[in-house]
Amino acid sequence: MSHHGPRLSTRSQQIVAGYASVAANFDVEKLHREQGVNIPTSGASINQCPHAAAARAAARMADDLASAARAKKSLDAKGSLAGRPVHHKAATESTKAKHTGFDYEAFYKGELAKKHQDKSYRYFNNINRLARKFPVAHTANPRDEVEVWCSNDYLGMGNNPVVLETMHRTLDKYGHGAGGTRNIAGNGAMHLGLERELRLHRKEAALVFSSCYVANDATLSTLGTKLPGCVIFSDTMNHASMIQGMRHSTPKRVIFKHNDLEDLETKLQQYPKETPKIIAFESVYSMCGSIGPVKEICDLAEQYGAITFLDEVHAVGLYGPRGAGVAEHLDYDAHLAAGSSPDPIPGSVMDRIDIITGTLGKSYGAVGGYIAGSEEFVDMIRSYAPGFIFTTSLPPATVAGARASIVYQSEYLGDRQLKQINVREVKRRLAELDIPVVPGSSHIVPVLVGDAALARAASDKLLSEHDIYVQAINYPTVARGEERLRITVTPRHTMEQMEGLIRSLNQVFEELNINRLSDWKLAGGRAGVGIPGAADDVQPIWTDEQIGLLNGTAPRSLRNAEKSVVDMRAVTIARSRFDVLLGPVYGELQPTEDFDTPAVGATFKAPLVDREVAHDITVSA
């Protein structure tokens, strides 16, 4: 401790002023230098050091607790201790213990103070989605119900009746947990069946992870570490999971401007074709709603010897004739004609993508993530990625529900079409009211606010005064000054609910004096809003023909008195996937309240699937 002597002697006035808890602490000194905190050698005040102030407050609290403990001990000495836990005395006395070194609690408090100061502190709302009333949830009070307008359960599959039926049956037969990692007791027929189902992407193999965050992180970190001299090219707006995967590996990282092909090519040109290269990007960017130039990036990858890593998290279930994502959607007619065949379509965009990652936790209403690619690639990740090897596998019921959801959506187009119709309607109404929406071709509806405090206030007002839950999105999820309300419209939102959202949002904008689109135009624009020409070329990726608007087959938005429709053909096929493990199911579904009951007497034929026997299903009274 002798090395502290000289430093303490020059800080005596600081110590007297209440700086004692951090003076001569080199870690805190370094923290001060990084944060720009300057403590003078004389005339110091406790207010100049947030860590000292926090320490003083903690010390006062400790003294109060100690005094209370002494008083309680005195009372206990006079009476019986019967009924008290054995650890009571030790727990009481532990309040007297104090750190004599680094003040950890003050450090934690200081870090949180920074989040509060820049308005990026995250508040979690208590929202409990109701299976029988989607998209309605209750708050902490079960009697207080709100409409949810920011869920990533994009299609309402979290309470689809065939999904719930499958999960209940699986739970009854196989129990709750998986029992271990995939390598030790946690690799079952349900997991293997789900990975076979992910032939949806027409790839040779797939691998399921506990989440797509883990899938992205584990895959990119493993590839980056194993590929010799690898360089990863990353879109500046890539998700945190991809960024973490790159940070956890050893290769050089090159960041290119968002969706900027010219910038990407310029940077690719700087490396020999023989250098291993990965281009990591997304198909749908969730906070702005833009869609990546998937085909054009494939062109550059082939030209410069790179492989492509495409995150389809916010696209699977929503795009393409079978819900395989944007890569499938770009060759819509070819994939529609190919049907459920797992065989690749040579030359298609999806075939040209090397690695696809997706999630089970958004459009499919479950939890988990996955990768899809060549058999050798998937086997290498399975064999080397710690994020896969050392994690308990997903519960069988969850896996079965996810598989049923994928099958249902791959066989039924109506939910995807209706979602697009509702998204178009909400965007149209917002534009009429001059409410600023970040331009994008996808289903995401990002309403620009441009201020963290205002975004939080708007979210709070919508929830407390209008029973509408829309989460504010602040830094670091989006850049400072680009704070927004991210609205997600589902096929289960009714016309009346959409009208209520628009009306309430308009009122909140008026009450909080939030910038309208016209205001952003006068200010020069921000985040693509109010910038001349920024929205000119933005067209929905779903065409009128694909939605069914041209031939009159498009589904119609629901009214409040109407119930969502379950497609019984898709139900039949989804059920058939589990005939071997769970036994065939005949008769009616047990519908949730907001689904129409299947028509009595309807008969459907299930196709041969996974070598399982086709059967007739009759829905009877």
Curated annotation (Swiss-Prot):
Pyridoxal 5'-phosphate binds at S286, H314, T359, T391, T392. Gene3D superfamilies: Aspartate Aminotransferase, domain 1, Type I PLP-dependent aspartate aminotransferase-like (Major domain). Its cofactor is pyridoxal 5'-phosphate. The active site is at K362. InterPro entries: 4pyrrol_synth_NH2levulA_synth, Aminotrans_II_pyridoxalP_BS, Aminotransferase_I/II_large, AON_synthase_class-II, PyrdxlP-dep_Trfase, PyrdxlP-dep_Trfase_major, PyrdxlP-dep_Trfase_small. The keyword Protein biosynthesis does not apply. Substrate binds at R122, S234, T477. Keywords: Acyltransferase, Heme biosynthesis, Mitochondrion, Pyridoxal phosphate, Transferase, Transit peptide. GO terms for biological process: protoporphyrinogen IX biosynthetic process. NCBIfam families: 5aminolev_synth. Catalyzes the synthesis of 5-aminolevulinate (ALA) from succinyl-CoA and glycine, the first and rate-limiting step in heme biosynthesis. This is 5-aminolevulinate synthase, mitochondrial. It comes from Agaricus bisporus.
